[in-house]
């Protein structure tokens, strides 16, 4: 609740005379609203004003209903007003002499308020708050005043000539107030502008004076003159004029005005030089003179035409050859006339109609082309212009430059797998553009490094490929993946049976940028120990891990007694297999060994003077047990627990309860009364105890009366502390008591070895006293001899000679079997502590690396075209197209190293040529034709020719025909040749027969060999020779 509200409550409670007095409706305001109120409006009611969105409230926003005469109600202050917001409104700093601001700060915008308070010893008249109005004035009331409460006042200030002050027509002035002086127009204030009334009743300074203000003479005006009035008082005007060739820039006159605390001339003009624009250029000509952009007034330029451009063509100047820079009516520089022109004087020159393929003419189309005519070309969509798009008809009747050509733009060059192209983010690929390819580390480029865009819009040669590079190992291997170097991942690896992928090693490979190849490792699959079964055992060892494929066989233990056996339930053999989990698993659950029993049943059991304390009731089956206890006064004789055996009897026999013979009368006695009857119970002690004497227990019964039992007394046997040895210690150093059976172990300090028994035990001697089992050992200094054991590397081998033991600094070189990778150092050394440093390495099985797809060979194929993954051991077979010969191994095998066993073969084109002499050949061969490898031809001769040789031949890999091509011989030589041939055949036959008869005659052995390899067949034919011109022959 505000102060006004509190006042209203106060009036309502304290001044009951105001009850029933009310105020009229609050004054309305434009563009505003009044808070809700109810009628009648009682004294003490507060109403609030607010303005619409774009209006500002000027004045107090709340009014209070009060009464001054206790008769009528009235509002305590006038209503505020709402002014439309003026964003440009700005009020000056408000000053209240004798007061100060308590709220409000600069700048003062429309609607801002300032609240004042008076200084000490001053009181306020007027409203303490004022608002900045749209008219840049403070309102809605005048600024408040602060009146001094001191009795001393300053006297009234005198008037000054040609000036005024803020306290004119005012009497004395209260201390703390100030007076401001100002001069009339044309005068300057000399002295203090503001003087203050002091508390002493005196002014802080003497009143100032107002002196007439005058401007200084303007002096010389560059490139012109100025006309000044005789007296340069405030308000006079000076006029400016420019020399010829200059023009006035700025106002033509300047005025003497007051400026701050002095006087000055208003802005003065300058005389700027008049310039003409650059002389207009002319086609086929030039001008002599100033060629700058701004040419001075009065300058002259002279025009001339260019030299003859070519033979038969010259230029003629038409118009005035000289121009002068002058001014127009607007004082703007201009040339005295238009520029001349140079026109050609040509003979009859005519150029042919220009042509362009895959393009068109976009301008300059004519039926006839003469000297200097130009045409502009553009290409069809998808083609690029090569050359100048504009050509000109010259004086020789030809086009220059020559007509362009339209070439097709290439598509973006393709990306390659495992590589990149250097296209510099180009979006357009014109003919002639070259793109360079490169491969990522670990890959090698196959094909040309660069391709080029041809005018047909295609790339040539074919785009290269990035094939997997062979790793040239540097010998460096990392067990963790490198973070900032290229690693070629292994995605094709697999492990053999009994192994699974587990971890990787990274082999560094040589290259322009060293890179790494991931090698997957195989971990042997192992199973946990096979389950242990009750009443049975398995053939497995006591290993913690069992290798994959291990089989164990279960058997049952022998029967616990005769007639009882254990039967194996389940599979007797289980095998270590693999699953998708981290470890191997057994192929099945372990079997069970269950008892195989006949119908066993023992008789009902009962003892006199006793009772059963545990066990079931009858009937009793195998291994059922019963436990007995005797009644008080009876002693159990026999075993307290019996068991039902397989033979239907109890084991041991059923006990009996016998009446106790000794009824205890008193506590044990150390001395036996004379004449007493004694019964010995036990005269010795258990192991670990020493007999120290006897005691006597008094007994009494009806038959014997009083008698005594002799009872032995036993104490625990102790040993003295074991001996301390030099350069060593034993495990009982911190113990105080050593009982019978306790054991201590000795060990020596570093550099000493133990001589004697390592362990001693507390025992008893012949007299029953405690003693150690032997003498204490000794610690002797160790001789400087080093013996390292023979290092065993599973899946590996030693490169140097093997010994049973190794001495200090002996070095062993080890390596892993093929298919395994080493984890550790290949070189180990025998250390003085009989160990190998840096430790015996291990060999980890490498994963089977899948081979990459085998390379294709031009003009051939292989059998692996539809196979996605090539595992170790897989093979492919290459073959060539018809007419091509396979060069290299046809069969390639994928190795465990992930490479192919041989380089891929290639297909070599093999051709056989036709013979140079083809006379008489009618069919089978064509002149100058090349025949592919394997081709078979069958020859036929023309009439009058005879075939000599085999009619069929085949093209071989050495480019030769096999058998050699036959020839066609003219039949005119046939009779002679046939006769010679017949004679040679007959002569050969006779020689063979003669040699055969001679050899048989000498050997006197005749036999027949039926072997097809050595058999021969002779057939004699009659040869006819026919002369077509002599039928009689």
Curated annotation (Swiss-Prot):
Give residue ranges on the Extracellular side: 21-971
Expression (tissue specificity): Mature B-lymphocytes, T-lymphocytes, pharyngeal epithelial cells, astrocytes and follicular dendritic cells of the spleen.
Sequence ranges assigned to domain Sushi in this UniProt record? 21-84, 89-148, 152-212, 213-273, 274-344, 349-408, 409-468, 469-524, 525-595, 600-659, 660-716, 717-781, 786-845, 849-909, 910-970
Q: Name one GO cellular component term.
A: extracellular space
* Membrane topology of this protein: Single-pass type I membrane protein
What domain of life does the native source organism fall in?
Eukaryota
Q: Which InterPro entries match?
A: SEZ6_CSMD_C4BPB_Regulators, Sushi/SCR/CCP_sf, Sushi_SCR_CCP_dom
So which residues are the signal peptide here?
1-20
Effect ascribed to mutating residue 128 to A: Strongly reduced affinity for C3
Q: Answer yes or no on keyword Cell membrane.
A: yes
UniProt keywords (A-Z) are: Cell membrane, Complement pathway, Disulfide bond, Glycoprotein, Host cell receptor for virus entry, Host-virus interaction, Immunity, Innate immunity, Membrane, Receptor, Repeat, Signal, Sushi, Systemic lupus erythematosus, Transmembrane, Transmembrane helix
Q: Which GO terms describe its biological process?
A: B cell activation; B cell differentiation; B cell proliferation; complement activation, alternative pathway; complement activation, classical pathway; immune response; negative regulation of complement activation, classical pathway; symbiont entry into host cell
Write down the glycosylated positions.
121, 127, 294, 372, 492, 623, 682, 800, 823, 861, 911
For this UniProt entry, what is the primary localization, expressed as one broad class?
Answer: membrane
Q: Name one GO molecular function term.
A: protein homodimerization activity
Entry's transmembrane regions: 972-999
Q: What does this protein do?
A: Serves as a receptor for various ligands including complement component CD3d, HNRNPU OR IFNA1. When C3d is bound to antigens, attaches to C3d on B-cell surface and thereby facilitates the recognition and uptake of antigens by B-cells. This interaction enhances B-cell activation and subsequent immune responses. Forms a complex with several partners on the surface of B-cells including CD19, FCRL5 and CD81, to form the B-cell coreceptor complex that plays a crucial role in B-cell activation and signaling.
UniProt disease link:
Systemic lupus erythematosus 9: A chronic, relapsing, inflammatory, and often febrile multisystemic disorder of connective tissue, characterized principally by involvement of the skin, joints, kidneys and serosal membranes. It is of unknown etiology, but is thought to represent a failure of the regulatory mechanisms of the autoimmune system. The disease is marked by a wide range of system dysfunctions, an elevated erythrocyte sedimentation rate, and the formation of LE cells in the blood or bone marrow.
* UniProt subunit comment: Interacts (via Sushi domain 1 and 2) with C3. Interacts with CD19. Part of a complex composed of CD19, CR2/CD21, CD81 and IFITM1/CD225 in the membrane of mature B-cells. Interacts (via Sushi domain 1 and 2) with FCER2 (via the C-terminus). Interacts with CD23. Interacts with FCRL5. Interacts with CR1. Interacts with INFNA1. (Microbial infection) Interacts with Epstein-Barr virus gp350 protein.
Designated name of the protein: Complement receptor type 2
Q: Which organism is it from?
A: Homo sapiens (Human)
Record gene name: CR2
